[in-house]
Amino acid sequence: MAEDIGALVEAVRAHPGVRAKAEIGLVREVFGESDWLAGPGDDGAVVMHEGMALVVGGEAILPAFVAADPYGAGVAAVTTNLNDLAAMGAWPLALVDTVTGPRAVVRPVLEGMRWAAGLYDVPVVGGHLTGTTGAPSLSAFGLGRADRPLSARAAAPGQSLVVAACLDGQMRADFPFFPSFDERGGRLAGDVRLLAEGASAGWVVAAKD
């Protein structure tokens, strides 16, 4: 069993998605050490305002994905932000986006965002758009409210570990993404709010997307 666990640990450490997280260390090099409430944050940053914990976060979508599937990239911009807010124990409030590129790319990006935002019942309230003939780019940013913010840094030995993931769906052939919209559909709006409910009730104390 110990050998199996050791092999699993090494496989996880070698995964490209995990190795890419090491680049986050650059933020600490530039901005210095800070607690997770003040930022740089965890999956999001917690901003205290008049006694309310607001959670903000952002995601830049892989440029190759934006160019290859702009509609899917728009959907991903919504999903990734809501997943980050959920991991912070936040109820999603709103999204904004920044999009650049030719109209033929920008339009399906926005259509994908509109569809996904409707599916999750979270409004896209604004952003920035620049029409250009250059390479397209897409980033989006989420705002949420947390009764009891969560952080990966609150994890400790002896806690019960639960993997909260959707198993309904199929892996894409072209990019390492696992959409479940067709299979899960209308239940996703509730799914993305489960951790906020758990955090508010006090039975979730740490999380990581």
Where are these regions (language model features)?
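Helix-biased detector of long, well-ordered alpha-helical tracts
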Residues: 1-209
